Curated annotation (Swiss-Prot):
Family listed: Belongs to the YqgF nuclease family.
InterPro entries: RNaseH-like_sf (IPR012337), YqgF (IPR005227), YqgF/RNaseH-like_dom (IPR006641), YqgF/RNaseH-like_dom_sf (IPR037027)
Chief subcellular location: cytoplasm
Any one GO biological process: rRNA 5'-end processing
Protein source organism: Protochlamydia amoebophila (strain UWE25)
Role of this protein: Could be a nuclease involved in processing of the 5'-end of pre-16S rRNA.
Keywords annotated in UniProt: Cytoplasm, Hydrolase, Nuclease, Ribosome biogenesis
NCBIfam families referenced in this protein's UniProt entry, alphabetically: RNAse_H_YqgF (TIGR00250)
GO cellular component: cytosol
EC number: 3.1.-.-
UniProt protein name: Putative pre-16S rRNA nuclease
Gene3D superfamilies listed in its UniProt record: YqgF/RNase H-like domain (3.30.420.140)
Length: 150
């Protein structure tokens, strides 16, 4: 019996100081789908290890591989970087040191605003919105990246 290669996907990340939202593409890399939220640890290194373990478990469960990771870079409206953008860059560097998967930073300006607006329109309670806003933001970041590839 022939071993079929595992389908590959692209992973989207919305990094936050307390939570990280994850989204993934479909096999054709056209549509972004929300996945899960990972809570951060006190130290960045611990968060990266926890995230890689989570990604590994997801890949095992879904029998897929991640070919690329897209991390939202929160630029200011002027295009300049601020404190959180510097934290994202540091996080991306730590992640790249521990995985051979290529990592790309992607402009995420206003994605959280867009996610919150979409969730308000969906009639979810504030409590439910707060639980999913990070994965919806990750999906928006990833979808923007996927759309740019067409």
């Amino acid at each position: 019996m022939e071993n079929k290669p595992k389908p590959s996907r692209i992973l989207g990340i919305d990094f936050g100081m307390s939570r990280i939202g994850l989204a993934q593409s479909d096999e054709r890399k056209i549509i972004a789908m929300p996945l899960i939220t990972v809570h951060t640890e006190k130290k960045s290194e611990q968060t990266v290890i926890k995230l890689l373990e989570t990604i590994s478990q997801l890949c095992e469960t879904q029998k897929c591989e991640i070919e690329e990771i897209v991390i939202g870079l929160p630029l200011m409206m002027s295009g300049r970087t601020g404190f959180l953008a510097d934290e994202v860059k540091h996080f991306a560097q730590l992640l790249q040191q521990l995985t051979p998967i290529p990592i790309r930073l992607w402009d995420e300006r206003l994605t959280t605003v867009q996610a919150e607006r979409s969730l308000r329109e969906s009639q979810l309670t504030r409590k439910k919105r707060s639980k999913v806003v990070d994965i919806v933001s990750a999906s928006i970041i990833l979808q923007s990246y996927l759309d740019s590839r067409c």
